[in-house]
């Protein structure tokens, strides 16, 4: 990989990305603690060939990745015994950045928490919720999340494109991705329809995807186009076209609580904040018994009060992860993962409230979303929970 040239392009972004900036030492968490950190080929070669201060700093602290030919995963940092990047100083700031400059960071470190996709030749940029500043910028706005187009300069070789979709290549095929834009707009509109609770919106979304898959299996593409057109023209009357009573309502069962409090789960968690959080929950020996006696409905008022946070989080996930096309052609699996992610966040907030009387507040919701997201994004510990219909 050679150094790229600086280009100009239009980027489609959630509006919060326009003002997002890393707050560095003012951040309550550190980006790279607890994670495997990959090094792209360009940066790896720079480390290998440097003769000066950079070489002195990095020697013995990185390795070539012998298991991957991917230029973005060409090498990786040698994580310390306490699961931290070897370049984090005592103030949890990056030594490479501080002593040698941002230009000597790997693409992962330079670009985090930004996510880049290309949809029909349009660049898209959004933010990962494992970053507390992204959570604050994106989710605490009580207005509906909006999307804008801006022009930006960028080095094509210094960004990692997560997903590329060319919906026009599938026109007149049997693949639902040909309707990508209609499905995406409708999905976001459903999640932003405040006439329904968050659980109802997720159920409507699941029913919508179920309808699409059923019609696709019948090869009834005229009906699919008719459904998309009707919903697009009458977005406020969504339930006239989608009967969400046909899907199991989104709810949290006692079995779900049992699973997410399992000690085996705790032992596999990587993120420091989540590990401490779950460890504290597991100290309460009576927590599960207390759940059975607790009137969970009494918390609905608080969850409804802060529903805009969950709405913005879910809309961001839909946009960032290209939902429902992030699991191949299995729309049902995609929506189940989104629902289970929401259930995880809500369940841990409920458990926290019962265990230590911590209130359901903006601050605590953001804490759980950010802490949980570090493991959801960078480890497989929650994979079974996300992919099963629990």
Predicted regions and their residues:
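Generic alpha-helix detector with strongest preference for long hydrophobic helices that associate
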Residues: 3, 12-13, 28, 32, ...
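Generic alpha-helical secondary structure signal
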Residues: 41-45, 52, 181, 185, ...
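Iron-sulfur-associated redox domains of electron-transfer enzymes in respiratory
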Residues: 111, 119-122, 136-150, 177-184, ...
């Amino acid at each position: 990989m050679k150094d790229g040239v600086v280009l100009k392009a239009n980027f489609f972004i959630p509006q919060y990305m326009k003002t997002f900036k890393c707050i560095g030492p003012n951040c309550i968490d550190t980006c790279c603690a607890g994670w495997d950190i990959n090094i792209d080929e360009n940066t790896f070669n720079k480390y290998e060939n440097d003769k000066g201060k950079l070489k002195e700093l990095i020697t013995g602290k990185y390795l070539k990745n012998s298991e991957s030919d991917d230029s973005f995963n060409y090498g990786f940092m040698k994580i310390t015994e306490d699961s931290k990047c070897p370049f984090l100083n005592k103030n949890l700031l990056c030594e490479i950045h501080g002593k040698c400059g941002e230009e000597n960071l790997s693409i992962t470190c330079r670009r985090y928490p930004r996510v880049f996709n290309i949809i029909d030749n349009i660049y898209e940029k959004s933010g990962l919720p494992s970053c507390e500043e992204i959570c604050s910028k994106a989710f605490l706005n009580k207005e509906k999340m909006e999307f804008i187009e801006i022009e930006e300069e960028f080095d094509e070789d210094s960004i990692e494109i997560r997903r590329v979709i060319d919906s026009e290549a599938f026109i007149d095929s049997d693949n639902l991705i040909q309707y990508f834009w209609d499905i995406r707009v409708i999905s976001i509109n459903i999640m932003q329809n405040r006439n329904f609770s968050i659980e109802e919106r997720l159920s409507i979304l699941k029913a919508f995807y179920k309808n699409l898959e059923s019609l696709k299996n019948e090869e009834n593409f005229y009906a699919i186009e008719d459904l998309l057109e009707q919903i697009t023209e009458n977005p406020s009357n969504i339930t006239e076209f989608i009967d969400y009573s046909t899907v199991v309502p989104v709810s949290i069962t006692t079995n779900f609580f049992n699973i997410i409090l399992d000690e085996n789960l705790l032992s596999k968690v990587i993120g420091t904040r989540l590990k401490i959080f779950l460890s504290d929950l597991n100290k309460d020996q009576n927590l599960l018994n207390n759940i059975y006696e607790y009137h969970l409905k009494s918390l609905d008022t608080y969850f409804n009060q802060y529903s805009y946070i969950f709405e913005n989080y879910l809309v961001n996930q839909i946009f960032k992860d290209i939902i429902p096309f992030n699991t191949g052609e299995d729309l049902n699996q995609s929506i189940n993962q989104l629902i289970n992610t929401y259930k995880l966040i809500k369940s841990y907030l409920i458990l926290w409230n019962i265990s230590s009387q911590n209130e359901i507040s903006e601050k605590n919701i953001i804490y759980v979303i950010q802490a949980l997201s570090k493991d959801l994004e960078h480890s497989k510990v929650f994979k079974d929970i996300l992919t099963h219909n629990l």
